[in-house]
Structure formats: C-alpha cells, structure tokens
Design a protein with these regions (language model features):
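Solvent-exposed helix/loop surface patches that form functional interfaces
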Residues: 114-150
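Envelope-exposed proteins and targeting segments
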Residues: 45, 64, 73, 86, ...
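An acidic-aromatic
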Residues: 74-123
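Gly/Pro-enriched, hydrophobic low-complexity segments
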Residues: 135-215
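A short, Trp-centered hydrophobic/proline-enriched beta-strand micro-motif
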Residues: 37-59
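N-terminal, post-signal-peptide region of Sec/Tat-exported proteins
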Residues: 58-80
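Bacterial Sec signal peptide processing site at the extreme N-terminus
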Residues: 13-36
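Sec-dependent bacterial lipoprotein signal peptides
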Residues: 1-19
Length: 215
C-alpha cells in the first residue's frame, strides 16, 4: 500500500531556516540538570501522545496524523495520511513488530522501520523515536547530545539522524518537561513532528478508538 503524495504544510517550509544553530555552551549547572532529567524521563514509560507529522522524502511530502500509546501492555503507533489517504498501525509484539493497514494487510518483522518503509515508502525511525520523542537518546548506540541551559536536549545526533528540539511543554505536577516540536533529518529525509497532547498513561485502548480497524 503505497500512499499518494499530498500537499505540504506551509509552516513546514519555513522550518529549514529555523533549525540552524551554533554550538551550545555546557556549564556545570546545565550538565547537572541534564543528568537529573534522564531518570524521570526513562521512568516515564507509560504515555499517550497525539500530534502531527510532516514527512519529506526526496520530492515527496506526506502530512500524517500521529497517535501513539506506549504502555507496559500495549505499544501501538497509528499514522493516518491526510485527506483520508490511508492509515497504518504498528504494534510491538515482544521482540517483533506487526504492521496493519486499514484495508486488512498484516505483516510482521523484527524492524518497525523496515516494515513501514516496505509497506508505505515512509522512512520514519520508529524504534529510536520511542526515546527521542521524550527527549532522550536511545540506548544501545552512540549518541552526541547538545543540551540547553535548562538541561534539556537541544540537538541529538544518533543512528545517522540529527534531531533538533525546537520547543518543550512546560512541566507540571504530573509530567516532566516534554518535547512539543521536533525537526529531524537524515540524508534526503526530513521529518517535522508537532505533539499536540501528552498524557501520563493510556486511558483507553485502540480497540475503542478505532473499532473497525484491524488489530
């Protein structure tokens, strides 16, 4: 199921110039704040986010809706193309991943990124994004973080990706400060992510959200 190209968001076109940044000085204070932030973010492993993705691959642009439930019993990522052009869901099943489409196609593999690319042509690093979207380096591979004065990730280089953290939500009593806008690039692929809502834990399952969508 290869989905057709849709028109780009005008806002995303202005983002290229907004992502240029110089090196960020690291002070003892900011480094200490960064060290303090990492444990609460790792412990924040039950969450539900909703947002939007603008995906640029060569000359093609896709605008996608994003809904991601990450809980101890369920890890389900749903991407829906604009204008009703299609929907896919990726669910983690132990050490493997299952991809389902709205028209009933189901595939399994040990790589979510490869599954998504094979079925849709989209190049989205799902496995790393599970950590990057919270403002953390993914474990198990070298990373080069740059942090801001508040001890938050400003730029992260990992697995060939450059991840720019453009904005954070303000922390409250229930949640730590979490990314709100990210810009990512690797080769000819550019991804803009806007997170509209964070929740501390899933409140309902996808079976209730999309009752007609195959599991």
């Amino acid at each position: 199921m290869r989905l057709p190209q849709v028109l780009p968001l005008l806002l995303a076109l202005s983002l290229l110039g907004a992502c240029s940044t110089g090196s960020i000085p690291v002070t003892d204070q900011s480094h200490g704040l960064w060290q303090q932030r990492q444990a609460p973010l790792r412990d924040f492993d039950q969450w539900h986010l909703r947002g939007r993705v603008a995906l640029f691959i060569n000359e093609e642009v896709y605008n996608l809706g994003l809904d991601w439930i990450h809980g101890r019993g369920d890890n389900s990522l749903t991407l829906e193309a604009a204008l009703g052009q299609g929907m896919v869901r990726i669910r983690r099943l132990g050490d493997a991943y299952q991809l389902s489409t709205a028209d009933g196609e189901v595939r399994r593999a040990d790589s979510a990124e490869r599954l998504l690319r094979q079925v849709t042509g989209w190049d989205i690093p799902v496995e790393g994004l599970e950590y990057w979207v919270r403002g953390l380096p993914a474990p198990g591979s070298p990373a080069r973080p740059e942090i801001d004065a508040s001890g938050r990730l400003k730029i992260l280089q990992q697995e060939g990706w450059w991840i720019h953290y453009l904005d954070y939500d303000e922390p409250d009593d229930a949640l730590p400060a979490l990314p709100r806008r990210l810009y990512m690039k690797r080769g000819r692929v550019r991804i803009k992510i806007v997170i509209d809502q964070w929740q501390k834990a899933p409140t309902r399952q996808y079976e209730n959200l999309f009752p007609d969508f195959p599991g």
